[in-house]
Each structure stands twice: as C-alpha cells, then as structure tokens.
Design a protein with these regions (language model features):
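Intrinsically disordered, low-complexity Pro/Gly/Ser/Thr-rich segments with frequent PxxP/GP/PP motifs
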Residues: 57-89, 95
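A generic structural signal for short beta-strands and their flanking turns/coil linkers
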Residues: 32-34, 47, 66, 88, ...
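Short solvent-exposed strand-capping/beta-turn motif centered on an Asx-Ser/Thr pair
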Residues: 38-44
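C-terminal interaction-tip segments
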Residues: 1-31, 35, 94-115
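Short, solvent-exposed loop/turn segments that connect beta-strands within catalytic domains
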Residues: 44-45, 57-60, 100-101
Length: 115
C-alpha cells in the first residue's frame, strides 16, 4: 500500500453542485481528510458554510456540518478525520448572504491518500 499527502483548496461558492467539490478520491484510492480549514475573508459579513461527503462512491451526500457559522475575518477548523472510500467526494459550499452580497470564503483540506 502506498500513501501520499495531498492538499485541496477551493474558492467557496453558493451552489450545492459539482462546483463545490473540493476533493474526489480516485477510483482505487481511499483517503483520510485530516482537517478542513474554512476562512471567511470578509471584514463585515459572517458566512454560513456546509460541508458534505458522499457515502457510496459519489452519489449520496451526507452533511458533516450544516450552516456552520464563520464570523467575519475568522477561520473555522474541522479537525477530526473524515474517511473517504474510492470515488467519494468532499463538497463545501456557502449559504447565500441575506443581503445578496457575495460570499468571500476559501477552504483548504489536508488529505492522506492510500492506494
């Protein structure tokens, strides 16, 4: 078994679709997401973010965190491991701001791939 560390990053949007896919495990790879860092770059607006993973190789999503509050100029860290099976997806997206302003959020994950 070979293992390697990977980094994944994303400019977080507001759509719960493939544009929010931060990482997808390869077809013959299992992965351990060691931590997810979600940074709100806005100096005025808080952000609410959602973190989801698939449980069946890419089609059925379950929330790891839902409407997680990230205050302005702050970072939220999900520091417990998330295990992904082959073809599973890690998705991060934000709820739209109530005042219709755009969200200014970035996400980063540290991942161990095992093949």
């Amino acid at each position: 078994m070979a293992s390697s560390f990977k980094n994944a990053g994303l400019d977080v949007g507001v759509l719960d679709d493939a544009t929010g896919n931060m990482y997808t495990a390869g077809g013959s790879v299992t992965a351990v997401v060691h931590a997810v860092y979600i940074s709100n770059l806005s100096s005025t607006n808080s952000a609410k973010v959602n973190v989801k993973v698939t449980i069946d190789g890419g089609s059925t999503f379950r929330h790891v965190g839902r409407s997680l509050e990230v205050p302005a100029n702050n970072t939220l860290v999900l520091d417990k491991p998330i295990n992904l099976e082959p073809s599973d997806i890690l998705r991060v997206y934000a709820d739209p701001n109530p005042d219709s302003s755009s969200v200014d959020v970035e996400a980063y994950a540290s991942i161990l791939e095992i093949s």
